[in-house]
Amino acid sequence: MFTLNRIARLSLLFISMNIACAHAGEISADYIRGEGDVEGIKLAYRFDILKTYDFDPRIKVYAESSVNFWKYGTPEHYDSNFVVSISPVLQYTFCECMEGELYGEVGIGLSLLDDTEFAGKDVSTHYQFEDRLGVGYRFGEAQEYSIALRYFHYSNAGFKKPNPGLDFISFSFSKAY
């Protein structure tokens, strides 16, 4: 059941996505795997903040707005969480190889969690930082497709205790438009 908070959060996400539509974008779907039996999906929209030709052709800066759905446990003992995030990301192309581009990326953004207790952890606050570190490969005739492996860490940076953090690995497929 959607609560008023979830509707407000979804509205905020889609407003940020609509603002982003003025730029060329990229849509991404991620499979997420966390500690224990945690898994989920992440749907994201990305748009360039700094185009490669504005600076160094190997550097790209983009913003990502996303919605995450996480689940934990079995049908008898089930837990879920809904998360919206917005994050600037710095991407660096290491090499052009096999008709594609191998890149690495880092970013720190903000997230809003629906529930502060998830998968047996109390993360204290609905607001969390979303840290990421990833590697990926861009390919296709116009480099419009990308696959990536990323590590995500969510925490409140110690603003409130407890702060155990949540860690995830994701596999992503995206298409640029």
Task: Give short role names for the model-derived ranges.
Residues 37-41, 80-86, 125-131, 165-169:
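Residues that define the transmembrane beta-barrel architecture of outer-membrane proteins
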Residues 25-29, 57-65, 84, 102-108, ...:
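Transmembrane beta-strands of outer-membrane beta-barrel proteins
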Residues 22-24, 50-59, 95-102, 141-144:
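Short loop/turn motifs that connect adjacent beta-strands in outer-membrane beta-barrel proteins
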Residues 43, 139, 165-177:
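Outer-membrane beta-barrel "beta-signal"
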Residues 31-37, 47-49, 65-71, 108-114, ...:
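Transmembrane beta-strands of outer-membrane beta-barrel pores
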Residues 1-24:
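Cleavable N-terminal export/targeting peptides
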